[in-house]
A protein has these predicted regions:
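Structural motif
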Residues: 98-100, 160-164, 201, 280-282, ...
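N-terminal export/assembly segments and adjacent metallocofactor-ligating motifs
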Residues: 1-227, 231-260, 266
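Short acidic, S/G/P-rich loop/turn micro-motifs used as interaction or catalytic elements
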Residues: 105-107, 166-170, 287-288, 341-347
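Active-site phosphate/pyrophosphate-binding segments
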Residues: 143-144, 216-329
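Short beta-strand/loop segments at the ligand-binding rim of alpha/beta enzyme cores
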Residues: 188-202, 334-335, 356-365
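Short, surface-exposed connector motifs at secondary-structure boundaries
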Residues: 90-98, 274-280, 332-335, 359
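Extracytoplasmic/secreted cell-surface and envelope-processing proteins
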Residues: 133, 170-172, 210, 290-291, ...
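Phosphate/diphosphate-binding loops
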Residues: 12-14, 179, 183, 200, ...
Length: 376
């Protein structure tokens, strides 16, 4: 008989509540937890594929301790987990300890990290793809102490302008909630519902899932996205009187590179302004901070903040993996705990881990495989 349990899968951009089916203690199927209404029981491709990791033939089968032989070859000896925890407790008490992990929105992990930092342990994060760059840039530009994440409330939006933001695909955060809330505004059960539908304008470099359902789509090179955003912002901020003359002149100058799309931009702005507080402008997380700021300014001018979009503060760490490497070189970090990921492999092009490992007195790696990061 199958058994079921509730869990969640944290990631760098959020977490997904799950229901896992298991047989004889082995998970066999992953589905979304229907009790979490924003996602409606849906999952993403990564959650569905995660069960395969449990059956990876290269998955580590226990705890190991590295022993360096005189020949220079490393040999792995299987040891008890309790012995590793005992040595870890002793080493942590000596100070100069750092934690290195992937970015995660796990609330439990955040709580534990705060307790560790209270004892003087430094915390660093690294991801192969930095999805949080736009959040940090926007937060810095707005004078916030932390990063600022744009969280659209598409269930309340009647007009949406997407600037290379695939909010229905897996390129942006919160895509499951976005899909459920946005598509809820496109249901037509009778002829009268057509007038109540939301309307989507998409400007993008390639065909995305979001572009596939757009009412109006403009194909535009990513290199021209800043110019187009400036073009739209100049007209919208001018009509709402939300910017002074000097700024508008500067925006028009920047938007000259997209002047051929002036008619498209003007029609879009007119439609956005026809639904104040029910319109929203979304910028792709990969776009530069100038576009992020322009999207914020347009949402503020539309009265959308708090209505169709929220800006929330995100957590932060003591620094990047580069700052960690510098602290190790300077002798300020002597003990390193690596939580998941494979940072040694992903950063070997710009961090000399062989040199750093000579300065580290103690390294513990928590992971599912014996890989490059385990070798240090």
């Amino acid at each position: 008989m199958p058994a079921y349990y509730a869990t969640s899968q944290p990631s760098s951009r959020g977490y997904i509540p799950l229901i896992v089916e298991s047989h004889q203690g082995r998970p066999t199927k992953v589905e979304g937890n229907p009790s979490y209404l924003p996602y409606g029981g849906s999952t993403d491709i990564y959650s569905q594929a995660s069960v395969l990791d449990l059956y990876d033939p290269d998955r580590a089968q226990g705890s190991f301790s590295r022993q360096s032989l005189k020949s220079g070859v490393n040999r792995w000896k299987k040891v008890s987990t309790s012995s590793i925890l005992e040595s870890l407790t002793e080493e942590v008490s000596n100070g100069k300890v750092a934690l290195l992990a992937n970015h995660s929105h796990s609330l439990t992990r955040q709580s534990l990290i705060q307790k560790a930092k209270a004892k003087g342990i430094k915390f660093f994060e690294h991801d192969v793809v930095d999805y949080c760059s736009a959040e940090r840039q926007l937060g810095k530009a707005l004078g916030a102490k932390l990063g600022m994440r744009a969280v659209p409330k598409l269930g309340s939006a009647k007009r949406v302008l997407s600037l290379d933001n695939d909010f229905l695909g897996n390129r942006e955060a919160n895509e499951l909630a976005n899909s459920k809330s946005f598509m809820g505004g496109r249901k037509v059960l009778n002829p009268g519902d057509a007038k109540k539908m939301n309307r989507l304008y998409v400007v993008e470099a390639d065909l995305s899932r979001t572009g596939g359902v757009a009412d109006h789509r403009l194909r535009l090179d990513s290199s021209a996205m800043t110019a187009f955003a400036s073009l739209v912002a100049a007209e919208l901020l001018s009509k709402t009187k939300a910017a002074d003359g000097a700024l508008l002149t500067h925006l028009k100058k920047l938007g000259a590179g997209a002047k051929e799309h002036q008619a498209w931009a003007s029609e879009t702005v007119a439609d956005l302004l026809s639904r104040p507080k029910q319109s929203v402008v979304l910028a792709g997380s990969h776009l530069p901070k100038e576009v992020q700021l322009l999207a914020y300014a347009m949402n503020r001018a539309l009265g959308s903040i708090g209505q169709t979009i929220d800006y929330i503060e995100t957590n932060h760490t003591d620094g990047s993996i580069d700052s960690l490497a510098k602290l190790v070189k300077d002798g300020e970090i002597e003990r390193l705990i690596i939580l998941g990921g494979n940072p040694v492999y992903h950063t070997k092009g710009f961090i000399n881990w062989e040199e750093l490992s000579k300065k580290l007195k103690y390294v513990v790696r928590l992971g599912s495989s014996i890989d490059e990061s385990s070798q240090i």
